[in-house]
């Protein structure tokens, strides 16, 4: 297992500046949140790559800004939109090969879209097939306003994808869905290969590690029992912490439990 920090924590700072700021804290494992498609190529992308090399960063995962578009494009009934989407996401996968990132985080269709399970799984597998060409694994994240908030649906994905479905466990999203992260682990077992960590308590669902009451020791023990050997990425919203050093401190608290 490896503890790290997501560059999403410093939004709306430009992505390259977020990566640099987190690297300067001493963080070595990172998830990069791409905030615009322009950041997957050209001078901006080269700057991100330079920062990665200078600070010897292990980029474990990439999260796209375009998650809200997945409903309208990937899970649409309109074939041209899906084709456009696949072309766009190839750009993410291509830049991931340069960054060395292996995990791509997918939110998927929102609940109100009414996307059928069958259509969802079909399109997910098509995206997985494309990602595999680049050595990338598409991981479904549990999201409180998406189909993926439902444990039964996640279990169906796991079963019907024949072992190809992989998952990101997000603790704050589980809390917002009124689910126990432990129940999600029990349901998905070794299909969980990446985790977004944050603490919580009554009335506050996204806090630095140690500022809430969640039992991270039990979480790591349960994950270890499944054979989990992935990343535990601190992912907080900018309004939920003060100084940047709190991100590093949160990561170190997780690291101490691994």
Model-identified regions with their sequence ranges:
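Histidine-acidic metal/acid-base catalytic patches
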Residues: 1-4, 11-26, 100-101, 150-169, ...
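N-terminal pre-domain/capping segments
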Residues: 1-91, 97, 132, 166, ...
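Active-site beta-loop-alpha junctions enriched in small/polar residues
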Residues: 6-10, 33-37, 64-67, 109-111, ...
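Active-site acidic/histidine proton-transfer and metal-coordination neighborhood
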Residues: 16-17, 54, 71-166
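Residue-level detector of anion-binding/catalytic polar loops
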Residues: 28-29, 58, 102, 137, ...
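Conserved beta-strand positions in the central sheet of alpha/beta enzyme cores
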Residues: 31, 61, 105, 139, ...
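Short, solvent-exposed loop/turn segments at secondary-structure boundaries
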Residues: 42-43, 73-75, 80, 114-119, ...
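Catalytic-core regions built around general acid/base machinery
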Residues: 47-54, 123-130, 183-184, 218-222
């Amino acid at each position: 297992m490896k503890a790290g920090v997501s560059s999403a924590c410093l939004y709306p700072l430009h992505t390259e500046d977020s990566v640099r700021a987190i690297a300067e804290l001493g963080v070595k494992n990172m998830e990069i949140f791409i905030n615009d498609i322009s950041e997957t190529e050209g001078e901006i992308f080269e700057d991100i790559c330079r920062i990665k090399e200078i600070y010897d960063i292990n980029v474990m995962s990439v999260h796209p800004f375009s998650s809200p578009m997945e409903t309208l494009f990937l899970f649409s009934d309109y074939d041209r939109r899906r084709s456009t989407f696949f072309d766009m996401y190839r750009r993410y996968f291509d830049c991931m090969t340069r960054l060395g990132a292996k995990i791509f985080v997918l939110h998927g269709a929102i609940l109100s879209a009414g996307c059928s399970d069958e259509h969802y799984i079909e399109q997910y597998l098509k995206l997985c097939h494309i990602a595999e060409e680049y050595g990338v694994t598409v991981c479904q994240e549990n999201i409180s306003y998406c189909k993926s908030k439902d444990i039964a649906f996640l279990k169906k994905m796991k079963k019907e994808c024949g072992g190809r479905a992989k998952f990101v466990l997000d603790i704050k999203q589980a809390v917002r869905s009124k689910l126990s992260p432990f129940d999600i682990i029990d349901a998905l077992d070794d299909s969980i290969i990446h985790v977004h960590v944050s603490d919580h308590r009554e009335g506050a669902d996204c806090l630095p590690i140690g500022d809430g009451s969640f039992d991270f020791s039990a979480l790591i023990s349960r994950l270890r029992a499944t054979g989990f050997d992935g990343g535990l990425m601190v992912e907080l919203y900018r309004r939920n912490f003060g100084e940047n050093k709190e991100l590093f401190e949160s990561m170190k608290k997780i690291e101490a439990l691994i």
